[in-house]
Amino acid sequence: MTKASFRAAILLTSVSKMAFVVRSVSRHAKLRGGLLMNPKTVKKALKDAIQAMTDYKWLFSARPGKDNTRNRKFPFQKVIPFILAFRGGTLNHEIMDFFGLDPSAGTSSAFIQRRSTILPEAFESLFHDFSRSVDENKLYRGLRLLAVDGSDLQIAANPKDPDSYYPGVNGQRAYNLLHINAMYDLHQHIYVDALVQKSRKADESAALTAMVDRSAIESALLLADRGYESYNNLAHIQEKGWNFLIRIKDGTAGIASGLALPATDEFDVPFHLKLTNKQSNEIKELLKDKNHYKHITNTIRFDYLPRTSRKYDPAVFFELHFRIVRFPISDTACETIITNLDASAFPLHDIKRLYAMRWGIETSFRNLKHTLGLLHLHAKKVEFVLQEIFAKLTMYNFCELITQSVVIRQAQKTHTYKVNFSDAVHICRQFFLGDVPPPILEAMLMRYILPIRPGR
């Protein structure tokens, strides 16, 4: 292969083209087509995805044709599962746990050198590949229930990276900060997409629109909190053919403040709002009807109107359809929701229940950081941290899918049970490493069950 061909292959591993690489590399790891989801098939899907990457490892090597070409103590096909299996101990302990008490095993410095030859996009590719292969497309009234949110991850201090560096104040140590934007399936309890940004350059709205635009999911309801309130976000979701349900501000700085709404604690008002960035005299007259027309200034990002226009260019409008719903949550507080769900199919009580389901992504972040051990990184370099972030996302999905396949109901049907996720992670990690056969895995998971109590 020519040097130009190698360079072209590496360009394919950029985030914007990663989906193409994933589809090309591993089409055979699909669980769709009637196969029953169980621990064995989940494990096979992940192993197949790793093998597919190994078959095309030059795509994910920092120097194609030079890196990962010889069979060393840390070959490519071992480094990938090794990083996936990280527990949170020291690197030396991780090596002993994975490779056994073998005096001939590689050292921690040899591993660091080897992982530097693997692009961070390798683990991003693995995450997307595996997630697609186990996607059962579970629907809620015809829709995928997806939540979007972000979470910060503190990493080792590096003053040379001003986009993520925070100097210590009041005696605190300096640190760098990454922001993980994630899209989470609330029915399958798995991450379906993620995008990592440096904290000082973080833009949650840009991350949301990127994940929405590149998704292959046909029909979905996207749930989000107040940080995602913007006309541009709503427009991207609407143009995707999806539905949205987003909590918005009640004060003077949000979408609701620019509309004439009832002065009551509970209402459900539909809107057909035409957006424009034109400000001719004729348009100014239309804008007086603020429940039907809205001016978008050129300082606000909106991707569906021309960036600039000349004085005599005709006005361009973008029509956005939504409802604003308000309801009390206590004697002194109300929630305000913007959604484009049909009012007859999803009345007020459904809106309340759906928004409460968004909490699932918050719980997932806690499990990702504490139970899976994302807070216990084995790296200082951002490139290595990115490897571990997507490795943890992959293993989170792996563990969730296996525990979901072992849901138990008592004979008297008093409660439905689920597996304790903290214990399950330890068991599933052993299963991934090949130390536990499926029957033993399921028997062990059944020992650590908790009742599912509705409403909690």
Ranges and model annotations:
Residues 2-5:
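Extreme N-terminal basic, low-complexity initiation segments
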Residues 166:
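Extracytosolic and intramembrane catalytic regions of membrane-associated proteins
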Residues 134-139, 328:
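Short boundary motifs at domain starts and secondary-structure transition points
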Residues 121-134:
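Short Lys/Arg-enriched helix C-cap and helix-to-coil transition segments
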Residues 144-146:
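Conserved beta-strand elements of the Class I
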Residues 8-89, 97-98, 105, 110-118, ...:
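Single, function-defining residue in the core of a domain
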